[in-house]
Amino acid sequence: MSLTNFQNEFQKLLDRKYFSPELHPVRKDAFSKFEAIGFPTQKWENWRFTNLSALKENHYLISEVKDAPQKTPDISNYKIEGLQTIVIYNGHFQQDISSVPEGVQLLTGSEYNELKNNQLNHSEKSPFDLLNTAFMDSGVCLIVGKNTIVGTPVRILFISDGDSSIMVNPRLHIDIESGS
């Protein structure tokens, strides 16, 4: 994917009305830094054995509303007894088929950002950190209440239908209160 394609997709993301404009400076700063350094190459010490050419050759699109399933997805092939599951399908949280244990609160990424007044912690250690911050488009937050014992594992299941090359950049937050 060329830098121009990333720039076009980034502008589409900024034009979305359902994201808080207060996040735009964080996004823009991260994207600007990504533009300056680009993808790692094999000349970078930590990436010398990693071939990233497939990332550059494909044209990825950000997930749009049209990418959300029109009906509840069948996840029966992914069922595991004794697990609570949170489902993200093509980048869209599926509340109807997601569950968490008692004492655990589940928020969407937007709800969590509002709760935290859009104060995001983010890393700038690699181009992928920057790209994820610039393109963060969804996500979930689990808040484990004070003195809560969670006896059931929670899994976050990401499903892509594979119909197109969708770029999904979720933010996952797990807040564990004291004594939990």
Enumerate the predicted regions with their spans.
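Glycine-rich and polybasic anion-binding loops at the starts of cofactor/ligand-binding domains
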Residues: 1-180
